[in-house]
């Protein structure tokens, strides 16, 4: 997910995406603890996507 794609989305879409990404991260961490996670880079990628969304929201002045 690129920053330009995120900047085109509305604030509501970004907040929904943030909620979805955080749930995905929890799920990935659970899979890692159980030992079923095969792609260990997925956690890092998800964290970076969360950071990108938060950056765009903060640029808009949205407090979270």
From Swiss-Prot:
InterPro entries this protein is in? Ribosomal_protein_uL29, Ribosomal_uL29, Ribosomal_uL29_sf
Among the GO biological process terms of this entry, one is: translation
Task: Say yes or no: keyword Ribosomal protein present.
Answer: yes
Q: Does the keyword Ribonucleoprotein apply?
A: yes
Alphabetically ordered keywords of this record: Ribonucleoprotein, Ribosomal protein
Where are the bilayer-spanning segments?
none
GO molecular function annotations of the record:
structural constituent of ribosome
Pfam family for this entry, one: Ribosomal_L29
GO CC annotations, alphabetized: cytosolic large ribosomal subunit
From which residue to which does the signal peptide run? none
UniProt cross-references to PANTHER family, sorted A to Z: 60S RIBOSOMAL PROTEIN L35/50S RIBOSOMAL PROTEIN L29, LARGE RIBOSOMAL SUBUNIT PROTEIN UL29C
In the record, the note on similarity to other proteins reads: Belongs to the universal ribosomal protein uL29 family.
Name the UniProt record assigns to this protein: Large ribosomal subunit protein uL29
Question: What is the originating organism of this protein?
Answer: Coprothermobacter proteolyticus (strain ATCC 35245 / DSM 5265 / OCM 4 / BT)
- The encoding gene is rpmC
